[in-house]
Swiss-Prot record:
Entry GO terms, CC: cytoskeleton
Top-level lineage group: Bacteria
Name this protein carries in UniProt: Decarboxylase NovR
Function: May mediate the 2 consecutive oxidative decarboxylation steps in the biosynthesis of the prenylated hydroxybenzoic acid moiety of novobiocin, an aminocoumarin family antibiotic that targets bacterial DNA gyrases.
Length: 270
């Protein structure tokens, strides 16, 4: 097993997230990627549930404020200029003209507060994520793609309606602990990432894994990957750098589909 890890390419094999000299440059980059991620999820049909669905990204300069997609704005038309910056304590908009989905934000703000390592939190109402969450069980290591979540996700099994109290958000954040994802019983999926791109990849992948699991369970009794192998594969594929890199083709495909958004891309540091 140690040889399998030793044979993995080092970090220098992969593309690296950019580093910025100024807060303004970093903020422009994050807001653009934020809008592109929402367009990506729109293509997957993850924006078809009315007011539901939120991506928050920590502002690089202003502590405890988060960029968010505004309530009731379609993902498929969003631009960086549409995003709002929201105070983590009051949930008031401090930059922009719209309001945030307060129930979703109560989850996100508490996760950000409990996990300062997390740049982004994603919670969307997907068909397969909601269906699998109804079983209130962890995702088994059924395929290679599920292994990044092996021993790296949790289940919150206390659905009590809309998350309108901060304490409910705190309980979810506490249950998440240091993991990259949590399944909310009867509700859906939440993923986090040290980068927005990693969080977006984990969310895309987790929903796909839920779909695969539901299909396999319906067909019979699938054979899971042994724990030792699942643990190794998770270490091989589950890093945030791998998550960031895995998302890059999806980001680039979203830009190719939406040339209007591509024209808004800020210049990267040289």
């Amino acid at each position: 097993m140690s040889e399998a890890l030793a044979n993995m390419p080092g970090d220098d094999y992969f593309r690296q997230p950019p580093v910025f000299d100024t807060y303004a440059e970093h903020r422009a980059y994050l807001k653009f990627r934020h809008a592109v991620a929402l367009r990506h999820f729109a293509r997957l049909g993850f924006d078809q549930d009315g007011l539901a669905g939120l991506i928050t990204v920590a502002d690089p300069e202003h502590a405890d404020t988060y960029w968010a997609n505004p309530l009731a704005h379609p993902f498929s038309t969003i631009t960086p200029a549409d995003l709002i910056r929201v105070d983590g304590d009051s949930a008031e908009t401090v930059e922009g003209q719209r309001r945030v989905n307060i129930a979703a934000f109560n989850i996100h703000a508490e996760i950000h507060r409990a996990r300062p390592d997390v740049q982004a939190v994603i919670h969307l109402h997907t068909v397969y994520g909601r269906a699998f969450s109804a079983f209130a069980r962890k995702l088994p290591p059924l395929t290679q793609d599920a292994c990044p979540f092996f021993e790296d996700h949790e289940v919150f099994d206390d659905f009590t309606g809309l998350v309108l109290a901060k304490d409910d958000g705190r309980r979810i954040a506490k249950q998440l602990r240091g993991h990259k994802a949590i399944l909310l019983k009867n509700h859906g999926l939440v993923t986090v990432g040290e980068t927005l791109d990693a969080a977006a990849w984990w969310f895309t992948l987790l929903d796909t894994c839920c779909h695969v699991q539901l299909l396999a369970d319906a067909a019979g009794k699938p054979e899971e990957i042994p724990a030792e192998v699942a643990r190794l594969t998770g270490r091989q594929l589950g890093s945030h750098l791998l998550g960031w890199n895995s998302y890059q083709p999806l980001h680039e495909a979203a830009l190719a589909r939406d040339p209007d958004l591509a024209t808004m891309e800020p210049a990267l540091p040289s």
